[in-house]
């Protein structure tokens, strides 16, 4: 994820408007990454262990 933060930093250095877009874009990407990991956990049955309590 270092390349993502470097990309955001390069955008933020070009102006305040770009800084806002960089923060929005990175938050969307991180949210999508969290969604993918949660989906893969469900597909691989890791959540079934929690539900059996």
From Swiss-Prot:
It comes from the Eukaryota. This is Uncharacterized protein DDB_G0272514. The lineage of its organism: Eukaryota, Amoebozoa, Evosea, Eumycetozoa, Dictyostelia.
């Amino acid at each position: 994820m270092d390349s993502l933060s470097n990309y955001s930093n390069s955008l933020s250095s070009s102006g305040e408007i770009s800084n806002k877009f960089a923060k929005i874009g990175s938050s969307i990407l991180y949210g999508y990454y969290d969604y993918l990991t949660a989906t893969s956990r469900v597909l691989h049955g890791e959540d079934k262990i929690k539900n059996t309590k």
